[in-house]
From Swiss-Prot:
Cofactor note: Binds 1 zinc ion per subunit.
Function in brief: Involved in base excision repair of DNA damaged by oxidation or by mutagenic agents. Acts as a DNA glycosylase that recognizes and removes damaged bases. Has a preference for oxidized purines, such as 7,8-dihydro-8-oxoguanine (8-oxoG). Has AP (apurinic/apyrimidinic) lyase activity and introduces nicks in the DNA strand. Cleaves the DNA backbone by beta-delta elimination to generate a single-strand break at the site of the removed base with both 3'- and 5'-phosphates.
One BP term from GO: base-excision repair
Enzyme nomenclature, EC number: 3.2.2.23, 4.2.99.18
HAMAP family: Fapy_DNA_glycosyl
Reactions accelerated catalytically: Hydrolysis of DNA containing ring-opened 7-methylguanine residues, releasing 2,6-diamino-4-hydroxy-5-(N-methyl)formamidopyrimidine; 2'-deoxyribonucleotide-(2'-deoxyribose 5'-phosphate)-2'-deoxyribonucleotide-DNA = a 3'-end 2'-deoxyribonucleotide-(2,3-dehydro-2,3-deoxyribose 5'-phosphate)-DNA + a 5'-end 5'-phospho-2'-deoxyribonucleoside-DNA + H(+)
Listed name of the protein: Formamidopyrimidine-DNA glycosylase
Amino acid sequence: MPELPEVETVVRTLRGLVMGKTIERVSVHLARIVRQPDDVEAFKSLLVGQTIQDIQRRAKFIQFFLNEDVLVSHLRMEGRYGVYQADDPVEKHTHVVFHFTDGTELRYRDVRQFGTMDLFPKGKETTIGPLAKLGVEPLDKSFTPEVLGKLLKGRSTKIKPLLLNQECIVGLGNIYVDESLFKAGIHPEKPAGKLTDKEVIRLHESIVSTLQEAVEQGGSSIKSYVNGQGEMGMFQQSLLVYGRKDEACTKCGAEIIRFVVGGRGTHICPDCQKNQ
């Protein structure tokens, strides 16, 4: 699933490709992608004539700000956007197409068919939709070691599942939680409330630096992820533990292991991340 760096990269590329374009019509080939409104014809009708004024990321969601509404899109496992000319061949698994007045198209393709789209009147998207209960943005200036410490204080939950909880901190998924915990030297099963002040500071620093580096490198293309221009990310080449089971730790040389925490495959260095 695309995480914060991948979604941020998609947003940045799409801004340069479709901002300012006006929707002439919309084609929906898989109705269940559209959740709000529950009438697909209403969804299509509401979008006609609206111009994309801005595109922003909130957590792992893409927000298309239009004249009257906000389209909130989640890529889920393998959703992707691409911009094409109207006469370009349409790839299999293309489920939604936004046809622009200039003859170009924004196409949404999703092999797994798990992605979602919700259309809300401006101002309502943060109160009644999937954005309503999201936690703090880890790349926002408001995310400080003190804020992280308050989120963890008194929690008996293991640190990894808590970091994956989007109501606490948004945008983190399996890849970047494993990487952040490794850099901070913290075992993923340690109770969140048991982290020392120094560990909280290290964890904060590792979360921010890991995400910033990943954004700079266009995200991680582990499976099918590409940005809005069809380009792969490069951060997978910089991963220190994720996906490196049985390889040597870059810090100490110990063998990286994989096990399950909270139902999620987890990679650690058993020497650098002792459970104590």
